[in-house]
Amino acid sequence: MELILVEALKTIFRPQVLIMIILCILMDVYYKKFIGMAGEFWVKRELKKLSDEYLVINDIMIKTKDGITHQIDHVVISKYGIFVIETKQYNGYIKGNDYDKRWLIKNGKKKIYVNNPLHQNYGHVKSLEEILNLPEEKLISLVCIPSRATLSVKSNNVTRIYDLLDKIASYKEEVIGNPNELYEIINNLNITDKAERKVHVKNAREIKSNKDEELKNKCPKCGGELIKRNGKYGEFMGCSN
């Protein structure tokens, strides 16, 4: 038995095996971050195709008067409006609308619910509305999905990456008289300090964790309490309503 254990330990501590174990751990830890960065990269590349009358700022962080920081994936400033873009690298079948608190994502038999990204982006819109002193109708909230997900989302503010430029170009009424000035304001207020950005990420994770805990025993459809029920195949969590 001891000999078998020694041989097993020798195998585990071989350099090649250790490297594979470390890589697997790193992939597990950073997979979501990598996927998110990849999505933002593709959207950033697409926005580079816009003409010079559109000014683009990527990955900005701003602080509002109440001290809350907001990290925004992409902002496009033009005379046709301020486009506030949130990138979501979802995969599978996605179902939702403007008003649902959470959207359904289905991959095969696996179902998960995520917070409505339009609601998240609304906070970003309001933050820019405050610092730029603009009415809300001059800011356009867009959620862009770069992946090949199947969308069943009832919203004019959700677009795929290959429709993004057409979506932006569909706004033809001139509503902004000073796009260059607004571009400079956002650039000057953009937080670039790494330490402050880390604090924002930490706070955002804590808020998400608290929200997830709050919604843990809530029905994703109506918000009612989930209770234990008995079914044909045993106990399951069902809506109390």
Residues of each region from the PLM?
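Surface-exposed interaction regions that form or flank ligand-binding interfaces
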Residues: M1-H70, I77-I82, Y93-G96, N107-N241
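Acidic/polar active-site rim loop that often engages polyanionic ligands
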Residues: D100-K106
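Short glycine-enriched loops at secondary-structure junctions
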Residues: K88-N91
